[in-house]
Amino acid sequence: MTHPKIVDKPWGREVWYAHNDQYAGKILEVDAGHLLSLQMHEVKHETLYLHSGRMRFTRGDDVFEWNPGESIEIPPHTVHRMEAIEKSVILEVSTPQLDDVVRLEDRYGRTTE
């Protein structure tokens, strides 16, 4: 058994529970009112599942409310952003490129990693 890696973020935290050369799994805990980066990925392909809370989600030109029990697929080169309407918990599974983040806009002053 291994212990997950906890990564503190300005909007909450990530719990990395799986990361190998084939896939990655994370839990994102986003505090109410916080906004993640407007971003895209060059290679990373991810699927997100909203476990609890409510989010406003931007994917390309579409903005919609995201509710518990719904999943969203984010292929590479898809511009996207999440905003927590309520404290939210998201399950993310993806290809293993966790450092593949191209930030286009960030409320917290972070740049591309």
Question: PLM features: residue spans?
Answer:
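Double-stranded beta-helix
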Residues: T2-K9, R81-E113
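Glycine- and acidic-residue-biased ligand/ion/polar-headgroup-sensing regions
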Residues: V43-R56
